[in-house]
Amino acid sequence: MGAPLSTARRGMGQNLSVPNPLGFFPDHQLDPLFRANSSSPDWDFNTNKDNWPMANKVGVGGFGPGFTPPHGGLLGWSPQAQGILTTSPPDPPPASTNRRSGRKPTPVSPPLRDTHPQAMQWNSTQFHQALLDPRVRGLYFPAGGSSSETQNPAPTIASLTSSIFSKTGDPAMNMENITSGLLRPLLVLQAVCFLLTKILTIPQSLDSWWTSLNFLGVPPGCPGQNSQSPISNHLPTSCPPTCPGYRWMCLRRFIIFLFILLLCLIFLLVLLDYQGMLPVCPLLPGSTTTSTGPCKTCTTLAQGTSMFPSCCCTKPSDGNCTCIPIPSSWAFGKYLWEWASARFSWLSLLVQFVQWCVGLSPTVWLLVIWMIWYWGPNLCSILSPFIPLLPIFCYLWASI
């Protein structure tokens, strides 16, 4: 008992006739006496290993009639349970020797613009011209096609297009055009809604400015709140329908809308007159009437095949016609100025005054700067409601 356990068991392990009846602890894998679970957990590498070869070679009837213990005992059929050390597979050969007989490395593909230039940008004309090349046609026709197509690479465009679309389908649609086609209406709708909301605030802003003229120095208030049906204090620009001042508010809004409509009409007339789309006959000096008709001395008739008459004719009492060319621009403006000058003689003095102001340009500019500096804040508060109309006017000016 005092001797080391390993020494006593080593002698016992040399006796190959000692059987292992029930298969417990085969090859001493779980025997704690041989320090299998302490210093050397893996029994395959334990120096005190004592194999029992006869335990792995159990014959029929070796342990009694009709009784054969399970091979490997309680640990199963694995090689480790049988005390056999399994080795890992050998390392593969290096890549230098493997590539001599194995798969070759994939070469670098050339860029798409060199191999398929027709695929860079869809163009029907260039695409059909590129199909005349046999190398390009090989991408769309099967390899086993007829030899006549290869020998005659210039078939009709209709048959070629139909054959291509029957195999490959319709060409891919340009997503950039689709995106721009969808976003453009949305952006226009957003701009229209924004301008509409701003335009609807113009009558309210002008109404506030209009009513503020009646309450100089005092906060504005609706006078209808002191009537027999008392209403809570409110501004004259936000009267409820039950307030007596509601009808006056609606009247002011209606007048403001008419004023805005008149302003838009004046802008449209100015735009058409600038484009030369108002062929108005000018007045002769000293005359107040004009009449259009066929001209005897002009090269183009007043009512000919041209879109607009290029000259106007006045018919005095003697029967002779006097032809006057219509200005290509500002014809209506010149007509109004001549008509006003014929009736108001003092306007001629205004022309001289304007010319004098133009001659004194530094002084005029300083005067304008001073006026803007002095009245600028008030003008900005008055003109700020009309700022949303400016983009509309600019768009109409550029489109017509």
UniProtKB/Swiss-Prot annotation:
A lipid is attached at G2 (N-myristoyl glycine). InterPro entries: HBV_HBSAG. Residues 2-119 are annotated as: Pre-S1. Keywords: Acetylation, Caveolin-mediated endocytosis of virus by host, Fusion of virus membrane with host endosomal membrane, Fusion of virus membrane with host membrane, Glycoprotein, Host-virus interaction, Lipoprotein, Membrane, Myristate, Transmembrane, Transmembrane helix, Viral attachment to host cell, Viral envelope protein, Viral penetration into host cytoplasm, Virion, Virus endocytosis by host, Virus entry into host cell. Glycans are attached at N320. Residues 70-115 are annotated as: Disordered. Residues 120-174 are annotated as: Pre-S2. Residues 2-181, 275-348, 399-400 are virion surface. The keyword Glycoprotein applies. One of its GO terms (biological process) is fusion of virus membrane with host endosome membrane. Residues 2-253, 203-253, 370-375 are intravirion. The chain crosses the membrane at residues 182-202, 254-274, 349-369, 376-398. Residues 79-88 have a biased composition (Polar residues). Systematic vaccination of individuals at risk of exposure to the virus has been the main method of controlling the morbidity and mortality associated with hepatitis B. The first hepatitis B vaccine was manufactured by the purification and inactivation of HBsAg obtained from the plasma of chronic hepatitis B virus carriers. The vaccine is now produced by recombinant DNA techniques and expression of the S isoform in yeast cells. The pre-S region do not seem to induce strong enough antigenic response. It is found in: Virion membrane. The large envelope protein exists in two topological conformations, one which is termed 'external' or Le-HBsAg and the other 'internal' or Li-HBsAg. In its external conformation the protein attaches the virus to cell receptors and thereby initiating infection. This interaction determines the species specificity and liver tropism. This attachment induces virion internalization predominantly through caveolin-mediated endocytosis. The large envelope protein also assures fusion between virion membrane and endosomal membrane. The middle envelope protein plays an important role in the budding of the virion. It is involved in the induction of budding in a nucleocapsid independent way. In this process the majority of envelope proteins bud to form subviral lipoprotein particles of 22 nm of diameter that do not contain a nucleocapsid. Belongs to the orthohepadnavirus major surface antigen family. HAMAP family: HBV_HBSAG. The large envelope protein is synthesized with the pre-S region at the cytosolic side of the endoplasmic reticulum and, hence will be within the virion after budding. Therefore the pre-S region is not N-glycosylated. Later a post-translational translocation of N-terminal pre-S and TM1 domains occur in about 50% of proteins at the virion surface. These molecules change their topology by an unknown mechanism, resulting in exposure of pre-S region at virion surface. This is Large envelope protein. The lineage of its organism: Viruses, Riboviria, Pararnavirae, Artverviricota, Revtraviricetes.
